[in-house]
Structures are given as C-alpha cells and as structure tokens.
Design a protein with these regions (language model features):
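Non-heme di-metal
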Residues: 1-165
Length: 165
C-alpha cells in the first residue's frame, strides 16, 4: 500500500504530493534504513559500509532537494497542506507496518551471538545485541523523528500515524 499511495499521487499528476511522498517520506525512510545498515556493517563489512555511506549522502541530497522545492510549493498552494498531511500519515502507517512485518520475520530466525567487541550503536541502541523489537523501535522512532523535522521545515504539520497491530 505504501507504493500504491505514492503511485496514485503520481498517476493523478499531483506534483506537490508526489514530491513530498518521494523526497521526504520515501527518501527520508531510505537514508535512515541505510544508516542503520551502515552502522551494523562497519566492523564486519567495511567495504559495504563505505558503499552505504555514499548511498546515504545521495539520499540526503534527494531529501534536501525535496525540502527546498516543497517549501516554495506549499507557500504557493497552502490549500494542499491537509491532503499532503493525510498522505504522510497514511504512508507512515504503511512504512511502520512493513518494518513490523520485517522484524517479526527476523524474530523467527536464530540469531548468531555477536562478538563481545561489537558496538554498533545506532541512536543509542547497540545493533549487535538488540532484539528485533528494539531494532524495529529505534528504526521507526528515528524515521518518524526525521519526518517531523523535515515536514516542519517545509510548513507541513506532521501527522502521527496509527501503530500497526
């Protein structure tokens, strides 16, 4: 449903909602997921971590473009704010549901014991020792925090999504 929501805006030629969905919500989620993967890869796969560092920088540029463009568009079309806020809330819910499903699936797999020297700290959570629930929570909280910050910069009020069951 996440992709369907975004594609619906694109198919309806709703440029403003499409840019918010793509450059704030989707790209904002992507760079946070990549940051988490990069943190977890630094010690054991530094080449992959370095690749992710470049990917994260690229995603941040996309988000920055979206912020710059959306701010001016929202000022020109304030009537779009309520619709975009609803879309952000809907897309955020689907994103959280995807995270929940992914980490529940991961919870069924046996986890290898992490070496004692591993300290992959991601926003206060050691990914080497965190449970799937803890990883899901830190990822969701980080992404939603980024959304709040970025949406406020462009004049859109963040809407708290329902939490998936």
């Amino acid at each position: 449903k996440f992709a369907e929501t975004l594609l619906e805006k694109v198919e309806n030629k709703d440029f403003i909602a499409g840019v918010v969905g793509q450059n704030i919500v989707l790209e904002g989620m992507a760079f946070t997921v990549f940051e988490m993967l990069e943190t977890g890869s630094r010690e054991f796969n530094p080449k992959f971590a370095q690749t992710l560092t470049g990917t994260i920088a690229d995603e941040r540029r996309h988000v920055g473009f979206g912020e710059n463009r959306i701010g001016s568009l929202i000022r020109e079309h304030p009537e779009k704010k309520a619709e975009i806020e609803k879309m952000q809330q809907e897309m955020s819910y689907y994103m959280l549901a995807t995270f929940s499903d992914s980490f529940k699936a991961d919870d069924t797999k046996p986890r290898a014991a992490a070496p004692a020297t591993t300290n992959a700290d991601f926003h206060g959570t050691n990914l080497a020792t965190a449970t799937p629930e803890q990883m899901e929570a830190v990822l969701a909280n980080t992404v939603l925090g980024e959304f709040k910050t970025r949406l406020a910069r462009v004049g859109i009020e963040y809407q708290t999504p329902k939490m998936p069951a």
